[in-house]
């Protein structure tokens, strides 16, 4: 799935036929990647919003990026499988080559490195920004500044971030801050020694601007080094859109910029088959496109916005025969939290070590979180829930 909002295109070669587009090169480029987002995720978000706005009507509410003038579709298989991972697919998006699952910007032999487009643009004088709602060293953001044979080499990826010289990193934190064994130099020290300012409070992040120099903005409310799921985010917490707005400020310059923005929590929600969390993060991803659209309206002849995805995740479907193809989006509207937040409630209950634990003890918590009344369940449904 791919959506393009402006006519100027990058003058880069296709890795297969080497044909080069020689039209106007955009000055400002926004590259959005919805991790794990395919047509089902996009459609479910639009249908959810439509049902919420007009209950009972079959009228989806279009997202910002589905209204773009150019649409396309992609085949996402990599050199390993028809079901690829984020490392190989991000490599394809960043450098133009397919590779093995788990590999970032290297070939199938893991000996030849590929140059991501960000390095080429930096050489041409562009400023570069990388934003994500998951750890900044995870596969998708890493493909825009790192080259490693194993996507799990988070510490090495972090060191390559520091060495990249790119101008703005925003969103999630670093994994393996002191290396895989916890015995290496703290990654923050390496990043700061490379000339970066680390902003890890809301006040510090909001104070960043085009005079701040190279900056890494780390979400102060992160959980597992990532932004909260959108459904769990408090109103005063920074959103993915906030990091995009700040990125535009930091990267502002006369020579142009490239910004990659990943909606990574879409993928995480899909891995857990959490439909409500997936929908809310897809909407948050779309909200993050709006600052780019606002910027585009100010610079319509110099701006390129691409919204795409790396692969589907979770096998989301919108209905099937056993439910009579009902979509039931209104049943998702009472959902107030992600599976991750509800896991904390379950763990707190377990920590109390009840003598005879019962599902009914959590009935009020379940109702508050999901709008589900255990009292209306059939015996069969109740058994399914208990076994789950």
Positions of PLM-derived features:
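Sec-dependent N-terminal signal peptides of Gram-positive bacterial secreted proteins and lipoproteins
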Residues: 1-5
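Generic low-complexity segments that are intrinsically disordered, proline-rich and/or Lys/Arg-biased
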Residues: 8-9, 61
């Amino acid at each position: 799935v791919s959506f393009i909002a402006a006519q100027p295109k990058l003058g880069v070669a296709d890795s297969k036929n080497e044909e080069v587009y020689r039209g106007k090169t955009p000055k400002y480029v926004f590259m959005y990647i919805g991790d794990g987002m395919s047509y089902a995720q996009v459609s479910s978000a639009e249908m959810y919003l439509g049902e919420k706005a007009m209950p009972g009507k079959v009228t989806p509410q279009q997202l910002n990026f589905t209204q773009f003038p150019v649409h396309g579709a992609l085949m996402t298989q990599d050199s390993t499988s028809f079901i690829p991972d984020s490392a190989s697919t991000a490599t394809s998006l960043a450098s133009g080559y397919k590779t093995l699952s788990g590999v970032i910007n290297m070939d199938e032999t893991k000996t030849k490195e590929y140059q991501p487009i960000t390095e080429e643009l930096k050489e041409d004088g562009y400023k570069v920004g990388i934003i994500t709602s998951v750890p900044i060293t995870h596969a998708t953001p890493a493909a825009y500044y790192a080259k490693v044979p194993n996507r799990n080499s988070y510490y090495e990826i972090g060191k390559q971030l520091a060495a990249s010289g790119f101008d703005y990193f925003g969103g999630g934190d670093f994994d393996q801050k002191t290396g895989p064994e916890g015995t290496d130099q703290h990654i923050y020290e390496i990043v700061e020694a490379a000339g970066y300012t680390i902003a890890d409070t809301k006040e510090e992040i909001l104070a960043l601007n085009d005079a701040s120099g190279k900056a890494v903005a780390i979400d102060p409310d992160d959980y597992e080094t990532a932004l909260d799921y959108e459904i769990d985010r408090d109103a005063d917490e920074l959103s993915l859109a906030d990091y995009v707005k700040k990125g535009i400020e930091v990267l502002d310059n006369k020579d142009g910029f490239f910004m990659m923005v990943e909606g990574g929590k879409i993928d995480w929600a899909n891995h857990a088959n959490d439909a409500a969390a997936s929908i809310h993060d897809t909407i948050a991803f779309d909200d993050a496109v709006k600052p780019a659209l606002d910027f585009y309206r100010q610079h319509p002849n110099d701006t390129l916005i691409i919204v795409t995805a790396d692969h589907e995740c979770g096998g989301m479907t919108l209905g099937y025969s056993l439910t009579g193809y009902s979509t039931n989006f209104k049943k998702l509207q009472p959902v107030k939290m992600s599976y991750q937040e509800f896991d904390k409630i379950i763990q707190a209950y377990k920590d109390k070590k009840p003598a005879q634990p019962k599902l009914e003890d959590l009935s009020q918590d379940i109702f508050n979180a999901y709008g589900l009344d255990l009292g209306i369940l059939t015996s069969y449904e109740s058994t399914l829930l208990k076994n789950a």
